[in-house]
């Protein structure tokens, strides 16, 4: 079996050291470097300030980011599976960890993703529940935008709980109805 060569940072990002700019070749968006320790502190602070709302805020941030990754890419001639591979390459090169499809099919009702070396919990230990809400949101946002419909993402295992990887279940779900729709007013 032939060895597949991963893209380098230069393949995925333009680094302009004179101007102090990093630009993604995938999304054409400007980016920045953010340390895992700083992320862990910010994540913990958001959870401390907003309590049970903290994880929801983090997931929504990821959701918006995931949708934007898909929206900004010209994929008119790109199959969904190829596009997912491009996103996986971006995650690896950005230092987020290695994401793989471990079971199922994201175009169907259910799929599982596994992330080894997840940056979002790499500096967080001893937790009793998963803490990668941002990454769950990225997966959900990208899936909603790429495959259509609405999805739910559940983090089933997390390195912050001493698991070997962060594993996510992606499920297609029924669209949420408004209060008026639920009452039959619309």
Residues covered by each model-derived region:
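Active-site helix/loop of acyl-thioester processing domains in fatty-acid/polyketide metabolism
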Residues: 132-148
């Amino acid at each position: 079996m032939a060895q597949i060569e991963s893209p380098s940072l230069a393949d995925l990002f333009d680094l302009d050291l004179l101007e102090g700019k990093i630009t993604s070749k995938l999304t054409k968006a400007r980016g920045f470097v953010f340390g895992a320790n700083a992320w862990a502190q910010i994540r913990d602070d958001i959870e401390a300030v907003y309590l049970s709302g903290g994880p929801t805020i983090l997931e929504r941030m990821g959701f918006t980011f995931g949708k934007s990754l898909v929206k900004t890419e010209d994929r008119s001639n790109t199959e969904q599976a190829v596009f997912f591979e491009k996103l996986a390459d971006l995650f690896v090169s950005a230092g987020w960890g290695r994401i793989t499809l471990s079971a199922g099919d994201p175009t169907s009702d259910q799929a599982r993703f596994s992330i080894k070396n997840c940056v979002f919990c790499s500096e967080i230990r001893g937790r009793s529940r998963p803490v990668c809400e941002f990454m769950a949101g990225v997966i959900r946002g990208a899936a909603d935008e790429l495959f259509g419909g609405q999805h739910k993402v559940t983090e089933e295992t997390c390195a912050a709980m001493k698991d070997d990887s962060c594993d996510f279940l992606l499920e297609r779900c029924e669209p949420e109805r408004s209060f008026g729709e639920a009452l039959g007013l619309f």
